[in-house]
């Protein structure tokens, strides 16, 4: 369980995945409550996950589902794995697929959601370092079609993270998407200071803007995270 406390005193409670798994040379079969293959294909490019700057406010597909059955292949070639999800829901079967490739410090993912909470979505993600600058880069592009209307929208994200000391890191993130908010844009900056391997303090600032002015907001978070 992860606990977060924001500066306004509100506690944000987040459950972890809860599932049973069978794993061997054949791959990994698991069932229960789990992040979808589509969500996992985000590759943690969202540096503000589980905060008010989470990309779920702009992008469809950040889902953790119940009634979940999934299979991940063993490595088909070095660094390449495929994950298949089947989730039962009231509107029919929700299927989620991903292809993930990792080599050294470079990661790539391609994912599809079919009938995922009323959307069909495609996502491309990559993470890689710029070693000469000491910066980790995250990039994501997504297209989502609302099944009931046939309207398709897209969005993209760029995140940058750099260590500024042995224990401190600064990070920036910018995202633009029409999927959940028309002309939605979110810019965020954060700083983490590690107290230990399992604890850190953090500061976040985020600005969300869109054509729907009632959703526009600025957020400041100061907190402590223990894993």
PLM regions: where:
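Outer-membrane beta-barrel pore domains and translocons
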Residues: 1-2, 34-36, 85-89, 111-115, ...
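Residues that define the transmembrane beta-barrel architecture of outer-membrane proteins
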Residues: 13-16, 63-67, 76, 91-95, ...
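Outer-membrane beta-barrel "beta-signal"
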Residues: 69, 193-197, 216-227
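Membrane-embedded beta-strands of outer-membrane beta-barrel proteins
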Residues: 18-20, 69-71, 82, 97-99, ...
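Outer-membrane beta-barrel and related beta-rich outer-membrane complex signature
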Residues: 41-45, 151, 215-217
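Detector for outer-membrane/organellar transmembrane beta-barrel domains
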Residues: 94-188, 193-194
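Short loop/turn motifs that connect adjacent beta-strands in outer-membrane beta-barrel proteins
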Residues: 26, 76-79, 130-134, 166-167, ...
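Outer membrane beta-barrel
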Residues: 1-91, 100-107
């Amino acid at each position: 369980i992860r606990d977060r406390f924001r500066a306004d005193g509100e506690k944000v409670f987040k459950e972890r995945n809860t599932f049973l798994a069978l794993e061997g040379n054949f791959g990994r079969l698991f069932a229960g409550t789990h992040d979808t293959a589509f969500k996992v294909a985000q590759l943690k490019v969202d540096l503000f996950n589980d905060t008010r700057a989470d990309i779920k406010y702009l992008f469809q597909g950040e889902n953790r589902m119940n009634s979940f059955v999934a299979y991940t292949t063993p490595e088909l070639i070095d660094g390449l794995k495929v994950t298949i999800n089947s989730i039962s829901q009231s509107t029919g079967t929700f299927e989620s697929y991903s292809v993930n490739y990792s080599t050294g410090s470079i990661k790539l993912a391609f994912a599809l959601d079919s009938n995922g909470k009323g959307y069909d979505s495609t996502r491309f993600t990559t993470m890689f370092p710029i070693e000469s600058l000491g910066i980790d880069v995250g990039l994501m592009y997504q297209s989502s079609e609302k099944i009931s209307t046939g309207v398709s929208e897209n969005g993209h994200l760029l995140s940058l993270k750099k260590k500024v000391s042995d224990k401190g890191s600064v990070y920036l993130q910018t995202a633009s998407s029409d999927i959940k908010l028309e002309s939605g844009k979110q810019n965020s900056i954060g700083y983490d200071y590690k107290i230990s391997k399992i604890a850190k303090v953090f500061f976040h600032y985020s600005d969300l803007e869109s054509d729907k002015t009632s959703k526009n907001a600025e957020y400041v978070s100061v907190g402590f995270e223990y894993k």
